[in-house]
UniProtKB/Swiss-Prot annotation:
Gene of this entry: lspA
InterPro entries, sorted: Peptidase_A8
Superkingdom of origin: Bacteria
Organism: Rickettsia bellii (strain OSU 85-389)
Job description of the protein: This protein specifically catalyzes the removal of signal peptides from prolipoproteins.
Catalytic site: D126, D144
Subcellular location: Cell inner membrane
Listed PANTHER family: LIPOPROTEIN SIGNAL PEPTIDASE
NCBIfam families tied to this protein: lspA
Protein name per the record: Lipoprotein signal peptidase
EC numbers: 3.4.23.36
């Protein structure tokens, strides 16, 4: 289905506002923590009994994977992430649901936030650290939160759409069954009692 120019423009304008807002929030929080933690190496700001703010650079991908191959992988990450963002933007523009639109906007906003870090700083800045007793979750940032939230929205949207399709299919099946029975009754030969 081809989108009208007006609908395409409105979708682009709305998505751009959401994405730019998420990128600004991500970059401002990173800027603040970089500027307030970098002069204090090893400093951990204890926020609660399970949350710290720390100064960490991630040279790999999610959860620090592939950080040992940084010199080879950074350009590959940049190219791959750019292609993925473009493809996600295409999917978002094709989305027919608010959940799809919102989910893709969050994923794209988070991905662009981390892409900016990798492009201009050579690594992604992470600062949020959750832990509980001996368990420690990998350090992450707001862009990662946006991506995760976007994926959750997309999964929920997918299952809602699937449920709606199944309900409509059942409803259409039931209607077809009723119409078939009514047609049988209309076409059934009339008995002798009806001739009176």
């Amino acid at each position: 289905m081809i989108l009208s120019f007006k609908k395409l423009y409105l979708t682009f304008a709305r998505s751009s506002r959401i994405i730019i807002t998420l990128v600004i929030i991500d970059q401002l929080t990173k800027w603040w923590f970089i500027n307030n933690l970098r002069w204090k190496p090893g400093l951990t700001l204890k926020v609660t009994s399970f949350l710290n703010m720390v100064y960490t650079w991630n040279y790999g991908i999610s959860f620090g994977l592939m950080r040992d191959y940084y010199q080879y992988s950074n350009i590959v990450f940049l190219i791959t992430n750019t292609i993925i963002v473009c493809y996600l933007y295409y999917l978002m523009m094709s989305s027919k649901t608010i959940g799809g639109f919102a989910g893709y906007s969050f994923v794209i906003g988070g991905a662009i936030g981390n892409l900016i870090d990798r492009s201009f700083r050579g690594a992604v800045f992470d600062f949020i650290h959750f832990y509980y007793q001996d368990y420690s979750f990998p350090v992450f940032n707001l862009a990662d939160c946006f991506i995760t939230l976007g994926v959750i929205i997309l999964v929920e949207d997918y299952y809602s759409a699937k449920k709606n399709i199944e309900e409509k299919a059942k409803e259409n099946y039931d209607k077809a069954q009723i119409e078939a029975m009514a047609e049988k009754i209309r076409n059934a030969p009339q008995g002798d009692n009806d001739k009176i």
